[in-house]
């Protein structure tokens, strides 16, 4: 033992540690013991160097790694350094020998905590140095003489689990897991997304800064697994470190109390992690820190403590604002934040919808006002046009168009009696006799190689539609009348001519004019059947125009073009020369220019009477009210094969 003591004897101000080929020297303080001011200074240096990065620290009382190579591999019991005041530290005597010093419980506790923190700091910053203190090297394992003299003795810990304490305090078995930047980024993104979700639902601002990763992950698992033991040590042991934190124990070293508060707060966070509804987080600028109230051995504390004691300026750590007792009822208003948010959104939507409806009503009112103004302005100008379209009453209607044409020599305008000759009683009896029931196939008139039966005559009775036989017979009578002196020569095509020309082309109808020269007459009459409607097209070689007449006001320029093309082909086929279309015009009479039918059955009568007036070079001066008269008159004319 004397040899061992001689080898371990050192100089007064120096300790030499041998590790492999390297020699590390630590210069000790010249005076004996550890003064509190120097310990506080070292603690302040440690705190200032690590405060910006260390988010969660932990509380543990151990010897300084720089002065005590013989550390505990397992956790010492809480009675050894928490409950009792028999905490021992190594000092240096005047002759260089190590000795124990037993200060007061408060200072000893702070020193032991600072020594433990110093040990952890030394481990984190100087891996090679801590390996030397632990008897390890980077390549080989050497056991120093001091370790042989003072072997490490494990101390059982009743408060903490052995596996967790060994993983925390044993540098030989603990391998710090490095957290990659990708993991930090993912965690930060998840926290930011959750913060935005909370802010959207509750309508409050949540400032949750980026957590630091300097705190080991295995420490959080160990602390969370032993939360029940920590709760007992925090709230039941009056002589423990928890009483110093919650009771805001004042000591001569302010930095030591700050570090202790941070350690205990981190313990409180992990031990109360299951009480998430009772923990309220806020921004670090709130300036207050709330502690729970317990009635075991902790005196009543105020709700607000200065945040400057726990967080340095510019720290990005999460700040625990208030920890509420689980027995305290939580205000129910926070659970209805989503409902209030929905109501607010609904109210905003309702206000927008009401504003939109108001604008729509204003636009409708403005449109109605403008429409009324336009109607009032056009009331006088369109009065005559509206009356013409409606034709009410028909008795007061006058001829729409009065065509002033140069009459040929020997022809004069006749009186109204000549235009509309009166039907005598004898003529009336004959017409009624035709309409009586009889043999429908009885031939009543025959001429122009056409035969008119009683069935055909019945189409002129009342509002029946005219058939092809009646129209073709009447057109032939117009051609026969045109042979009279002073009237324009007329040729009328069959009612099937235009339909055949349109569907089959010129080759299908070129033989229809084998015995007729269409270019030698003045007027060509072309009845046009549109399925259920009769119209008339007139080719006037004198005026060089093709005009379309429709009693319903229809426009059909296509029919006019088809007839003009027919004239070109007919001229080439019959006369062997081109038809000169220079000066020819195509017209479709508008509804304001010719009389319009006021029912759905007189279209055939209107087409025939258009042709009658045109072939006499007379104005079209009849109206809808004349249609019953024209029907009776046409019956008599067909029966006698002569126009009145």
UniProtKB/Swiss-Prot annotation:
Region (Disordered) location: 92-117, 156-184, 283-312
GO molecular function: deSUMOylase activity; endopeptidase activity; SUMO-specific endopeptidase activity
Keyword set, alphabetical order: Cytoplasm, Hydrolase, Nucleus, Phosphoprotein, Protease, Thiol protease, Ubl conjugation pathway
Compartmental location: Nucleus; Cytoplasm
Region of interest: Protease: 450-613
Motif (Nuclear localization signal): 171-177, 574-577, 628-634
Active-site residues, as the UniProt record annotates them: 533, 550, 603
Top-level EC class as recorded in UniProt: hydrolase
Motif Nuclear export signal per UniProt: ranges: 635-644
Any one GO cellular component localisation term in the record: nucleoplasm
Enzyme Commission number, as recorded: 3.4.22.-
Tissue and organ expression note: Highly expressed in testis. Expressed at lower levels in thymus, pancreas, spleen, liver, ovary and small intestine.
Effect of residue 603 to S: Exclusively nuclear. Loss of CCAR2 desumoylation
Positions of post-translational Phosphoserine modification: 57, 117, 132, 157
Consequence the record notes for mutating residue 597 to A: Abolishes SUMO2 processing and SUMO2 deconjugating activities
PROSITE patterns: ULP_PROTEASE
Impact after mutating residue 465 to A: Impairs SUMO2 processing and SUMO2 deconjugating activities
Region (Interaction with CCAR2): 1-200
Assembly and oligomerization: Interacts with RBM33; promoting ALKBH5 desumoylation and subsequent activation.
Described purpose of this protein according to its UniProt entry: Protease that catalyzes two essential functions in the SUMO pathway. The first is the hydrolysis of an alpha-linked peptide bond at the C-terminal end of the small ubiquitin-like modifier (SUMO) propeptides, SUMO1, SUMO2 and SUMO3 leading to the mature form of the proteins. The second is the deconjugation of SUMO1, SUMO2 and SUMO3 from targeted proteins, by cleaving an epsilon-linked peptide bond between the C-terminal glycine of the mature SUMO and the lysine epsilon-amino group of the target protein. Deconjugates SUMO1 from HIPK2.
Similarity section: Belongs to the peptidase C48 family.
Protein's UniProt name: Sentrin-specific protease 1
Organism, as annotated: Homo sapiens (Human)
């Amino acid at each position: 033992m004397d040899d061992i003591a001689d080898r371990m004897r050192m100089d007064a101000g120096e300790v030499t540690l041998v590790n492999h080929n390297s020699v590390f020297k630590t210069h000790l303080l010249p005076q004996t013991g550890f003064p509190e001011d120097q310990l506080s200074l070292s603690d302040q240096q440690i705190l200032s160097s690590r405060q910006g990065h260390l988010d969660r620290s932990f509380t543990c009382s151990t010897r300084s790694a720089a002065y005590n190579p013989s550390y505990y591999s397992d956790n010492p019991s809480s009675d050894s350094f928490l409950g009792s005041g028999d905490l021992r530290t190594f000092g240096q005597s005047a002759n260089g020998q190590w000795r124990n010093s037993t200060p007061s419980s408060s200072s000893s506790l702070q020193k032991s905590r600072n020594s433990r923190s110093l040990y952890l700091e030394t481990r984190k910053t100087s891996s090679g140095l801590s390996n030397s203190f632990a008897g390890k090297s980077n390549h080989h394992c050497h056991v120093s003489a001091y370790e042989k003299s003072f072997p490490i003795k494990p101390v059982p810990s009743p408060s903490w689990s052995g596996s967790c304490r060994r993983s925390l305090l044993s540098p030989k078995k603990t391998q710090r897991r490095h957290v990659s930047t990708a993991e930090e980024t993912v965690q930060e993104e998840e926290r930011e997304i959750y913060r935005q979700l909370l802010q959207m639902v509750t309508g409050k601002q949540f400032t949750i800064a980026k957590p630091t990763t300097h705190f080991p992950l295995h420490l959080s698992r160990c602390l969370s697994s032993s939360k029940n033991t920590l709760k007992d040590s925090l709230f039941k042991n009056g002589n423990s470190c928890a009483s110093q934190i919650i009771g805001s124990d004042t000591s001569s070293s302010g930095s030591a109390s700050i570090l202790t508060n941070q350690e205990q707060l981190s313990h409180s966070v992990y031990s109360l992690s299951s009480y998430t509804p009772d923990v309220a987080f806020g921004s670090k600028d709130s300036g207050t820190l709330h502690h729970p109230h317990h009635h075991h051995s902790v005196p009543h504390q105020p709700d607000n403590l200065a945040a400057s004691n726990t967080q340095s300026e510019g720290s990005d750590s999460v700040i625990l604002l208030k920890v509420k007792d689980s027995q305290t009822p939580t205000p129910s208003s926070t659970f209805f934040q989503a409902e209030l948010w929905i109501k607010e959104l609904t109210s905003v939507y309702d206000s927008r919808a009401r504003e939109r409806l108001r604008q729509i009503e204003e636009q409708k009112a403005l449109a109605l006002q403008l429409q009324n103004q336009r109607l009032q302005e056009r009331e006088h100008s369109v009065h005559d046009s509206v009356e013409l379209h409606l034709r009410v009453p028909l008795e007061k209607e006058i001829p729409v168009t009065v065509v002033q044409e140069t009459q040929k020599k020997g022809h004069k305008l006749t009186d109204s009696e000549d235009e509309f000759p009166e039907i005598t009683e004898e003529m009336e009896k004959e017409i009624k006799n035709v309409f009586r029931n009889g043999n429908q196939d009885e031939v009543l008139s025959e001429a122009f190689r056409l035969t008119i039966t009683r069935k055909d005559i019945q189409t002129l009775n009342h509002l029946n539609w005219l058939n092809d036989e009646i129209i073709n017979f009447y057109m032939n009578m117009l051609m026969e009348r045109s042979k009279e002196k002073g009237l324009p020569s007329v040729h009328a095509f069959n009612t099937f001519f235009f339909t055949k020309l349109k569907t089959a082309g010129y080759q299908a109808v070129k033989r229809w004019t084998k015995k007729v020269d269409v270019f030698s007459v003045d007027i060509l009459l072309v009845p046009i059947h549109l399925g259920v409607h009769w119209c008339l097209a007139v080719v006037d070689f004198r005026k060089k125009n093709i005009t379309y007449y429709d009693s319903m006001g229809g426009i059909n320029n296509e029919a006019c073009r088809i007839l003009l093309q027919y004239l070109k082909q007919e001229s080439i086929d019959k006369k062997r020369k081109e038809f000169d279309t220079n000066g020819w015009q195509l017209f479709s009479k508008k509804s304001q220019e010719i009389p319009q039918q006021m029912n759905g059955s007189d279209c055939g009568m209107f087409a025939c009477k258009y042709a009658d007036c045109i072939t006499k070079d007379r104005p079209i001066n009849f109206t809808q009210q004349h249609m019953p008269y024209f029907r009776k008159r046409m019956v008599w004319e067909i029966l006698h094969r002569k126009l009145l």
